[in-house]
Design a protein with these regions (language model features):
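Conserved small/polar residues in nucleotide/adenosyl-binding loops
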Residues: 175-177
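N-terminal ligand-binding/catalytic initiation module
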Residues: 1-156, 162
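Phosphate/ATP-binding catalytic cores across multiple sugar-kinase/actin-like superfamilies
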Residues: 171-172
Length: 177
């Protein structure tokens, strides 16, 4: 973490994301909150919604909002409310999207209201979301590049190896025999 902290401290001074609006549709947890806060500290305007209505942590969402991050999510949203939250993020006119499941990417591609957005790229976290994006590409309707995080070599090197191990240890520590 020290290397990451030093890098962020150095970059905060130059604000490399100043003038960039980022839209996030992710599980709103303490882990993802770090990403959102760092993006804001690096100068970005940040808007987020929960990537899954069942995983949003309300205390984290409230904290993000208190930090000046445009936050549209709460636990237990209905499908209609979930869609409304995605629309609110897109209404901020993000230039880069970070998505988990491609709900926001699909809406940006097929809802005519968002055709004028100047999105120059996105990331997708899940295999299911990447499959949805590939279907958009096969239709010839992909308007901007989308990076598949799941296919990244570093994800296989670190997240799959160490993240899975850490999750196993965390799960075992919760078992009370």
């Amino acid at each position: 973490m020290q290397i990451l902290d030093n890098t962020i401290s150095r970059l905060k001074k130059s604000k490399p994301l100043k003038g960039v609006t980022l839209g996030f549709c992710l599980h709103i947890t303490k882990e993802t909150s770090v990403l959102l806060i760092v993006a804001k500290e690096l100068g970005a305007k940040v808007a987020c919604c929960g990537g899954n209505p069942l995983t949003t942590q309300d205390d984290i969402a409230a904290f993000l909002a208190s930090q000046g991050i445009h936050t549209y999510c709460w636990a237990g949203q209905s499908p209609k409310e979930y869609d409304w939250c995605i629309q609110q993020v897109l209404n901020h006119k993000p230039q880069i999207l970070t998505d988990d499941g491609s709900d926001m990417n699909v809406k940006a591609h097929f809802d005519k209201k968002y055709n004028s957005l100047k999105i120059f790229g996105a990331t997708e976290e899940t295999t299911a979301g990447v499959n949805r994006i590939r279907a958009v590409e096969k239709q010839g309707k992909l308007r901007y590049p989308v990076i598949s995080v799941n296919d990244a070599y570093t994800k296989h090197m670190f997240d799959n190896k160490y993240g899975t191990g850490q999750s196993t240890i965390d799960g075992l520590s919760l078992i009370h025999i």
